[in-house]
């Protein structure tokens, strides 16, 4: 009954605060652990326990949306649905996740997955719904979860002072609202072993690392390599072709930028 309890508490919170502005963060265990689908969903997906809890998550989101609708709050409520990392299939649990995929490809064409520096590890779903302020659209802009903080502060005309408040968060409100399809000038990412990568424009650089290439439990490629890695993700989203050797000038540019970010000397212009 975990999902039912969490969903019930969320709905109660919304009802309690329906007459005033409110912020609610709701996390779910469904696509993490424990994966325990309610009897309403157990065996219904045809994809085992993992598929069943995804159905349960879908129900949970629907319950929250229905509550907002019933209170006439949906049009002027900002609703964000996102994840903290990319997918993992076999993470050590005996739930037949691999055997029952039935052709489903959680990573699509992207390399790696959860824990990884590659795109399937850091590229996540990010859905924003706000009928009163956002026209439906699909964005390919570069955007970081870290920037949600400063972007919402900008929406509220709330200055982030002192400068020590969320210093890495940048105002990306135009992108958040679907009005800018460019987004950040760069985004820094980190894998399980603290190996950093940086994306700027169409280029992605992963710093050299002597950490393990594969996570032993999940058999996931981590993106660690003793040599620098450079990918043009606009034409090579699967990160199959490391072009660091043929584009040394771009390796130098992005590695220098990454070192500046590490040293706190470059927070980006947007």
Predicted regions located by residue number:
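Histidine-centered active-site microenvironments of extracellular/periplasmic hydrolases
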Residues: 34-37, 43-47, 66, 70-133, ...
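A long, amphipathic alpha-helix that forms part
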Residues: 1, 5-14, 40-77, 101
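Intrinsically disordered, low-complexity polar regions and short flexible loop motifs
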Residues: 236
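Active-site His/acidic residue clusters
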Residues: 10-53, 88-90, 94-97, 269
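Loop/turn elements at helix/coil->beta-strand transitions in domains of secreted/extracellular proteins
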Residues: 17-24, 73-79, 123-124, 181-185, ...
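C-terminal cap/loop subdomain of S1 sulfatases and analogous C-terminal strand-loop tails that border
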Residues: 89-117, 133-141, 145-229, 233, ...
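Beta-strand elements within well-structured catalytic alpha/beta cores of enzymes
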Residues: 21-27, 54, 61, 78-83, ...
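Short, solvent-exposed turn/loop segments enriched in Gly/Ser/Thr/Pro and often Arg
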Residues: 25-34, 81-89, 168, 187-193, ...
């Amino acid at each position: 009954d975990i999902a039912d309890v969490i969903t019930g508490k969320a709905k109660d919170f919304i009802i309690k605060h329906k007459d005033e502005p409110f912020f609610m963060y709701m996390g779910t265990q469904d696509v993490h652990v424990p994966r325990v689908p309610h009897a309403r969903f157990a065996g219904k997906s045809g994809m085992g326990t993992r598929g069943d809890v995804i159905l349960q998550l879908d129900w949970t989101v629907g319950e929250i949306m229905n509550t907002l609708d019933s209170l006439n709050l949906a049009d002027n409520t900002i609703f964000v649905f996102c994840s903290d990392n990319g997918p993992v299939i076999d993470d050590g649990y005996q739930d037949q996740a691999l055997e029952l995929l039935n052709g489903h490809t959680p990573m699509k064409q992207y390399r790696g997955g959860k824990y990884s520096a590659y795109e399937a590890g850091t590229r996540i779903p990010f859905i924003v719904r706000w009928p009163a302020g956002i026209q439906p659209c699909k964005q390919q802009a570069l955007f970081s979860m870290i920037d949600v903080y400063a972007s919402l502060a900008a929406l509220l005309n709330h200055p982030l002072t002192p400068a020590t408040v969320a210093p890495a968060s940048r105002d990306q409100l135009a992108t958040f609202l679907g009005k800018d399809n460019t987004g950040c000038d760069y985004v820094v990412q980190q894998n399980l072993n603290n190996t950093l990568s940086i994306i700027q424009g169409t280029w992605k650089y992963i710093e050299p690392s002597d950490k393990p290439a594969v996570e032993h439990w999940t058999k996931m490629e981590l993106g660690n390599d003793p040599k620098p890695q450079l990918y043009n993700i606009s034409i090579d989203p699967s990160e199959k072709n490391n072009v660091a050797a043929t584009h040394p000038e771009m390796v130098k540019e992005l590695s220098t930028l990454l070192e500046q970010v590490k040293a706190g000397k470059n927070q980006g212009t947007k």
